Amino acid sequence: MPAKGRYFLNEGDEGPDQAALYEKYRLTSLHGPLLLLLLLVAAATCIALISIAFSHEDLRRHQVVLGTAFLMLTLFVALYVLVYVECLVQRWLRALALLTWACLMVLGSVLMWDSLENEAHAWEQVPFFLFVVFVVYALLPLSRRAAIVAGVTSTVSHLLVFGAVTRAFQTSMSSTQLGLQLLANAVILLGGNFTGAFHKHQLQDASRDLFIYTVKCIQIRRKLRVEKRQQENLLLSVLPAHISMGMKLAIIERLKEGGDRHYMPDNNFHSLYVKRHQNVSILYADIVGFTRLASDCSPKELVVVLNELFGKFDQIAKANECMRIKILGDCYYCVSGLPVSLPTHARNCVKMGLDICEAIKQVREATGVDISMRVGIHSGNVLCGVIGLRKWQYDVWSHDVSLANRMEAAGVPGRVHITEATLNHLDKAYEVEDGHGEQRDPYLKEMNIRTYLVIDPRSQQPPPPSHHLSKPKGDATLKMRASVRVTRYLESWGAARPFAHLNHRESVSSSETPISNGRRQKAIPLRRHRAPDRSASPKGRLEDDCDDEMLSAIEGLSSTRPCCSKSDDFHTFGPIFLEKGFEREYRLVPIPRARYDFACASLVFVCILLVHLLVMPRMATLGVSFGLVACLLGLVLSFCFATEFSRCFPSRSTLQAISESVETQPLVRLVLVVLTVGSLLTVAIINMPLTLNPGPEQPGDNKTSPLAAQNRVGTPCELLPYYTCSCILGFIACSVFLRMSLELKAMLLTVALVAYLLLFNLSPCWHVSGNSTETNGTQRTRLLLSDAQSMPSHTLAPGARETAPSPSYLERDLKIMVNFYLILFYATLILLSRQIDYYCRLDCLWKKKFKKEHEEFETMENVNRLLLENVLPAHVAAHFIGDKAAEDWYHQSYDCVCVMFASVPDFKVFYTECDVNKEGLECLRLLNEIIADFDELLLKPKFSGVEKIKTIGSTYMAAAGLSAPSGHENQDLERKHVHIGVLVEFSMALMSKLDGINRHSFNSFRLRVGINHGPVIAGVIGARKPQYDIWGNTVNVASRMESTGELGKIQVTEETCTILQGLGYSCECRGLINVKGKGELRTYFVCTDTAKFQGLGLN
């Protein structure tokens, strides 16, 4: 798994672009809460206007508040329209938020001064300013610091103004009572500040987590698209499209089954990806004189020459609708008519043969190096596909393929040699002459194949004057080595590097990107106006694309309409996931730092307790109820913070498990939340019936102790605002649990609201005189007088007994106020909880998508790794991975590499094409089993140093010693040459595998093996179909050791025999044999019966 810093932006290492994206995201995410606040305030103002209009007969007394409220309503509606216009949000959102706060403060000030027309009370507008304080943190798009400043300013302004005003206008309350009342106001507002700040902190952390996972998900999604495109390009660079998809699915299935090293087929046979095609033409081409040229080349020059030559051939093949099949040393063969049949397949191949002959002719004339092209073509049927499990190479098999190979061997340098079957498909498009191929190849004579040489139409035209085709005549040029002259000339052709196409910009798809809110975004335009240094880097281009996609995702995450927008992930009318099982998974997600939510709720309890202690009568029921809740919350907190006590107790693991269960166990967390929130909502109101019920005693009875009476703020009705504020604090405590289920939160708040409204509206304080027919004003006067008479004289202000209160506006306004603010806070918290629940679900959704896409990305990485390692050795594949891939040719020289060729000669006799074996397909199925079993041996740790190079028909080529470059001269002889012994052991394991296949298939195949060691050159050639290969005299001699060997034996050269004998192997001298191109060589057979017991150097 790649490191986090490699693929993702770290939270603490954000660049300017990332910081700007986060700022844009933060403002966008706060867009919806501001709209919600403006909508709530506008609705509340409208309701307040209506209630004042219908509850007061004389509206002239409230002209100021009515005018101000109407003006504020107009402003809030205007602000809503401005905020809704999203183009204004980014620049003016903070200004609009501050303007909204200022309007709320103005409205609160007007309401305060309006109350001075009656009797002033310290509890006036406390719920309103508590609402302002809470929404400053929860709904206004302000920074944490700005929100704290605004909240504290709102608190201090209310306390200072009402403290001064109440002291000046209040005549019925002592200084002690006024001080206690103002102190209770401070506790309420400070509790709102702290709870709001905690709520904002939690919400910002959750919002940042959502942003981080959104960025990660988009980055991984972009990388996934790149990986998929690279995977397709890589697979198509090795295999044709009609075969690659099936093999790709097989690789993914293999990874799911537990990795490539533990893969076992589902049946007795390995998958066979071979198809039969008819009416195709096969072209074989060999560079005559290349062996002599290659011996003079340095490793880099050899790789450059092969890449430039075969790159040019690939271009010619593409222009002539031919598909290159494979490169075998300096041999190049291709087919026309694959995978789609072409009526012009013969003409295509002939045209290509003439073009490559002309290309080599230009090289010869420009450099003076004696090389030419020999081309053979035959038309017929082929079986094409891939066999084996490792180092896939697209190949073709059939008798017609073998005949085409023979046509090349029997051809004439510089000419195109074709069979009569190909001539019949040319439709006289080219003139030909008799080829006499049967005179140069006995197989053609035996099969009575008539051959022809194609006459190049260009040879009949006068040669154009072209100075660059003339043979070099300068002395300096002639003194250059032939390889240097050829290399310099071929470099001017500018062939593409292997795998260069994998990092092209066009490989990144910019198709439509699904966003989680259900809206499908348009294709993201690729930025081309960036600075060259940024756009030149694949990493920079990837970051640009991620920024573009992130901007689209931010628009999709806009919370303007989360409740009503159509989504592919959520139900239309409820925050429930559509995906089956994901709803339960979401509810089981652990909640980190959940214990701090309980700590904040406990602080709200402390605020409610202080308010009751300051302004409520001190009765036994108050102590009992708050004592029980305090014990309960203490138990909950000890449960949540059990790890903090682990140092003091030996059972540390038990305490840690208890504490962690709060975050990881939903049922435990649910029980604790219900107990905590339920106890707070209950304790806020449970004492009200006892406090406000005057009981059977008469008004003149004084059964209240002086201490209790001293702590009363006034009449029972005047206690209602503080019970209301306590209930509101209980509501707010419910909001600190951000991840609480919306249904549970709504249920608790709804039950509490109904109970509160019933208790407040049915309170006895509204019906003190029972069925009395007195006016409300008289009831109010009697209530106030009776209550005043029941208090000790030292607690009343001078003249209080003689002062009669004003008419009974208080009762009516208190009732409206209680109902209004309870419903306002309820609606605010329900809508806010709905929005928070949406974002919590969105956060969980992005995390799930990130996890899923990250797993898919890792799968793609593994698939790409397997694909690349199926083309190249692992250490070579690393050269082509990353941003610097394909910047240079890959080549490497080795001093001591052991090369093995192992063939099954009897397979050529076994292979037949008839209806019984599906025209040879079943024969290839057996060959596929043989090669696949050979490949499975490579997975054993013992043979980890053996590298399969390729298969040539029924010949298996492998090498050992390629995993590390040259430079092991200081090692002892046994360890330096241990890989030679490993390859011999591998050869014997191949023989053993073949014997097992013979037993199951009732055949008698025998392996013929040739081994040689020495210096080689390794490299990757071919841009369209990159191929790893090795070259050198060592490879040629190893091939001759196989072709001149005997069945069931391993033939080695004299030098290799000496090394093997030093490693403890026994060898038998065969004697001198004639080897093509090498003359007579003394060779040896490795004794396979005793070698496995005498391999001393393999441990």
Curated annotation (Swiss-Prot):
Locate the region Mediates regulation of adenylate cyclase activity by C5 alpha-induced G- beta and gamma pathway. 479-484
List residues binding Mg(2+) 1: D286, D330
* The name this protein goes by in its record: Adenylate cyclase type 7
Catalyses which reaction? ATP = 3',5'-cyclic AMP + diphosphate
Q: Where does Mg(2+) 2 bind?
A: D286, I287, D330
Query: Where in the cell does this protein reside?
Result: Membrane
One of the GO BP terms on file: negative regulation of cytokine production involved in inflammatory response
Q: Where is this region: Mediates regulation of adenylate cyclase activity by sphingosine 1-phosphate-induced G alpha 13 pathway?
A: 493-501
Keyword Magnesium set for record: yes
Which cofactor does this sequence's record say it needs? Mg(2+); Mn(2+)
| Coiled-coil regions, chain positions | none
Source organism: Mus musculus
Tissue expression per record: Most abundant in heart, spleen and lung.
Cytoplasmic topological domain residue ranges: 1-33, 199-595, 834-1099
Q: How is its activity regulated?
A: Activated by the G protein alpha subunit. Activated by the G protein beta and gamma subunit complex. Activated by GNA13 and GNA12. Ethanol and phorbol 12,13-dibutanoate significantly potentiate adenylate cyclase activity generated in response to the activation of the prostanoid receptor by the agonist prostaglandin E1(1-) in a PKC-dependent manner. Inhibited by lithium.
Q: Give the note describing cofactor binding and stoichiometry.
A: Binds 2 magnesium ions per subunit. Is also active with manganese (in vitro).
Assigned keywords, A-Z: ATP-binding, cAMP biosynthesis, Glycoprotein, Lyase, Magnesium, Manganese, Membrane, Metal-binding, Nucleotide-binding, Repeat, Transmembrane, Transmembrane helix
Query: Encoded by which gene?
Result: Adcy7
Glycan attachment positions: N702
- Annotated membrane-spanning segments are 34-54, 63-83, 95-117, 122-142, 147-167, 178-198, 596-616, 621-641, 670-689, 719-738, 747-766, 813-833
Q: Where is this region: Modulates adenylate cyclase activity by modulating the binding of G(s)alpha to the high-affinity G(s)alpha binding site in 7C1a/7C2?
A: 508-585
